[in-house]
Design a protein with these regions (language model features):
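Long, amphipathic alpha-helical surface segments
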Residues: 2-21, 25-29, 54, 59, ...
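Export/targeting segments at the very N-terminus of extracytoplasmic proteins
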Residues: 2-32, 96, 100-122
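Short, functionally critical alpha-helical segments immediately adjacent to catalytic or ligand/cofactor-binding
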Residues: 27-38, 50, 128-135
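Structural recognition of the beta-strand scaffold that forms the well-ordered cores
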Residues: 29, 71-73, 130-135, 159-163
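Short, charged/polar N-terminal "headpieces" of proteins
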Residues: 35-48, 60
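Substrate-binding/active-site groove segments that recognize
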Residues: 49-84
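Alpha-helical segment that forms one wall of the substrate-binding/catalytic cleft
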Residues: 82-118, 124-145, 149, 157, ...
Length: 198
């Protein structure tokens, strides 16, 4: 339902891992990238987030993504280690809670292998956002072996932001092909990331 407010509780929440600004960026941008929907997020000082659906389709029933993987909510292909099945259905509240939990899992992985994005570094909110957004899309293991991660750990923020761009391909019929959707997403992540390089 549009305009319903959902509270995301801080239970060692996202803001504790990546900071308030990065958590807000993730909770606003991931639904836009994954589902095309618009949400409004208000962050409390304790890290609790109030998420309000404004517009756009919500995928409460599972669907097949561009490469045929069952997906639900805001890009979830699994939850608590269980793959999403095409028959799965969720409520809006479940989707919001699941998104926050999955972002926490991905953020922890990113922060563990990327000490160059530690909260003690100033002006890293946008780079942290880009790193977690990419990891949410391609997996933590891929992030941790990426050139972007190596650049961020070396405090080469611009180079790290630029290294996001090659992650624009999907596998179709056994071949890697550029996805216009992923190319656009990587460009948007890079643009946000570069705000820390200025």
């Amino acid at each position: 339902m549009a305009n319903d407010k959902l509270i995301v509780t801080p239970r060692r929440g996202l803001a504790a891992i990546v900071g308030l600004a990065t958590a807000s960026l993730l909770l606003v941008n991931i639904p836009k990238e994954e589902s095309g929907r618009t949400v409004k997020v208000e962050m409390a000082p304790d890290g609790a987030a109030t998420v309000q659906h404004i517009s756009g389709r919500q995928y409460l029933r599972a669907y097949l993504d561009i490469v045929g993987v069952p997906t639900a909510c805001d890009g979830l292909t699994s939850y608590h280690g269980r793959k999403i099945k095409i028959a799965d259905q969720f409520t809006e509240a479940q989707c919001t809670a699941m998104l926050e939990e999955e972002l926490v899992v991905h953020a922890k992985g990113v922060m563990q292998c990327t000490p160059g994005l530690a909260l003690t570094y100033p002006r890293r909110d946008h780079a942290r956002f880009a790193a977690v957004s990419l990891a949410y899309n391609v997996g933590v293991a891929n992030w941790c072996s990426s050139t972007a991660r190596r650049m961020f750990n070396a405090s080469r923020i611009t180079a790290g932001c630029d290294a996001l761009l090659p992650w624009n391909k999907v596998t179709k019929n056994g071949k890697k092909v550029v996805s216009n959707g992923l190319a656009g997403r990587r460009s948007r992540e890079r643009a946000i990331c570069l705000k820390d390089a200025a």
